[in-house]
Every structure is written in structure tokens, then in C-alpha cells.
Amino acid sequence: GPKIFGKKKGDTEYNLRALPIGGFVAMEGEDEGENVSEGSFNSVPVQSRILVVIAGAVMNILLGFVMMFAFTVQADSYSSTTISQFQPNAFTANTGLQTGDKIVEVNGYSIWNSRDLQFAISTLPYETVEGNTLEVYKERATSAACGVYNKYAKDESLSKDELQKYYNALSEGCSKINKAASKDEAKELLDETCKSIYALDKSYDMSKYKTPEIDTTTSRPRFMGDVKVVRDGKEITLENVQFFTYYADEDAEKENKPTVAFDFAVEPIEKNVGTVLGETFTQTCSMAKTVWTSLVWLVQGRFTFNDMSGPVGIATAVTQVASMGLQTGFVDAVNNILFVMILITVNLGIVNMLPFPALDGGRFLFLLIEWIFKKPIPRKA
């Protein structure tokens, strides 16, 4: 914007402009047509000019590290990518994953931490799966068993110890169902699981028991992909692992916009100086990797420009996360805003280094060519 106020100190002029959002540095001799005088930008060695050009992006990323440290150090512990347990009706448990698996790659996307895992799974493609497959049958069977358990989970007259017995029966039975090799076996194990739950209820009349009906006709969407894990010290690739997929509401179902969710828990990482610094580094690097990957996918057509946000979208996002945080407390609101600011800061640093003429990345490329060939690129063709 236009200059409101300016003051010159030495060879530098400081200005306050009409829109004091961010800032910029204009150096003598960097623009086309300016004279190359002593002390101007183009009069210094090319190595020094390269350092000046990349300094802004480097500072953005370093600031991202500092803010990420402030965000990370508050946590009591951190999440790994090693599966510790599955929910009783976990779909991933019957499509390949096992307790103790350390997930290191999803559909070719390397997994460094839990944030990578969330990004990789949430961006998986989804396909329509027929309802008559063994995997879907086992999922519906475990869900039916959970339905039986839920009747007792709502019973306030049961003590925690009593309810735990019901849950143990459910968990043990679902684990067997997930390992079933056929629908018939899964059905038998479903009966066994339901009866073991009802057997804990002394007032239940077992003669009235009926096998829960399983819908095998309805097709459904499934997020799926190849997952590389470390199991018993060896890397193995599990093909077409299907993740728990659902519609958030009726509108999402009408528009065929399913959502993916985790149906397993991961082992915690103990908090100490080393893990705090390690999480800070890997989380920031993961954020940078996410930005670059998203740009590549944009070129490949996996994302559209409609999925990207400009200033208005960013402002809206900040407002939304702040409002969500305020529902649980002021500190959560501040942390939510801090996380968005980390994302924006790292984004700016990375995008600014893209090799386009209008960005620092384009200038860096020209200076790099000048350094290699010992000759500047002509400013005019």
C-alpha cells in the first residue's frame, strides 16, 4: 500500500504503509534497470546473494520449529505408529493389520509419526466394496456382537467390574471373529460370542436367543490402500488394507462423501527431553512434507484449486479452530490458533522457494545458474 510514514537511518529507509500486514525488504540494485553501485545487491558475490534470497524462507521454517516446540512441549506424552490394540469391532483387524505392527508406509507415503499416519489415511482413495465379502461380513458380525454388549453398557445398575467382564467377553469373541477363514466360521463365532455375553446375565433366558442377522446385500464405500509395517523385526507389505469408513450425516451420504476413522489405538511415547526435541523436529518436517506432497497431488489432479484456501479461507479456518478450542478452554483455543499459524508459516517458507520467477525460489534458481556457470543470466532477452 501507499507509504504513510518513513524515516531514513544511514543507508536504510524504514516505511510504515497503509496495510501493515507482514513486511518486505527492497534492496538497492535488485530490480531490473537499477545501476549496480558499490554496496548494492548485485555488487556482492553470488554466494552472498543466494544467502540473502533464501534467508526469508529459512527464517519462516525456523520460526515454525520454534512454534512447534511451544506446541509440542505441552503434551504429557506422544503417539507412536505402533498398534497397541484394536476396538472390538475393528475393521482393520480383519483386513491385515495386527497388534504390534509398526506402520512405516501407507500407499507409498512414508510415515514418520502419528501426524503422517493421519494425513496418509485421510487422503487414501475410497472404493465401493460389495457387502457379500468375507471382510465386510466379519465387520458386520463384530458390530452385531457390539450391539449385544451395548445393551449392558447402558445398564447403570452394573458395576465397573461387572461391565468389564462383559467387555472382556466381547473383546475375546471379536478377536476370534476377525481371524475367521470363512463366513460360516464367523457366524459360529458370532453365536459363541453373543452367548458368552448373555451367559454373564443370570436373568437372560438362553432359549430365546437368536443369531443376529447380517446384511450381506448392501455395498459400501471403503478407504483402502497398501500398508507397509514392521512385524517381528521384518518389513512386510499388506495389500488393500481397508479402513473403517462411514458417513458423518445424511447429507454426506447423499453426496457420497464418506469419512475415514481409526479403529485402533497406538502405543504412547514417553515424554522426555529427547522425545520432545524429536517430536518437534519430525512434526515440523512432516508438516513441510505434507505441503510438498499436496502440491504434487495438485499437479497430478488428486486435489483441485477449490481445495486450497486464500486469505479469506485462512481467516475462516483460524476463527473456526479458535471457536472449537474455546469450547474446552482458553488454552486449547490458543493452541489451535498456534497450530494453524505453524501450518501457515511453514507453508510460506516452502511455497516461497518454488522455482517461479515471482518468488524467491525463482531468484534462487537464477542465482544458482549464475554460480555454476560463472555468468549471470541476461535480464533482457
PLM-predicted stretches and their roles:
Residues T12-N15, L19-P88:
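Internal alpha-helical transmembrane segments
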Residues L16, G56, T92, G100-I103, ...:
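Terminal peptide-recognition signature
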Residues R49-L62, D332, F339-M353:
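Pore domain of cation channels
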Residues G1-V36, V351-F373:
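Small-residue-rich helix-interface/hinge motifs
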Residues A93-R115, E127-K202, S207, T284:
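Conserved PDZ fold ligand-binding element
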Residues S40, V44, Y149-E156, K165-S171, ...:
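Functional transmembrane alpha-helices
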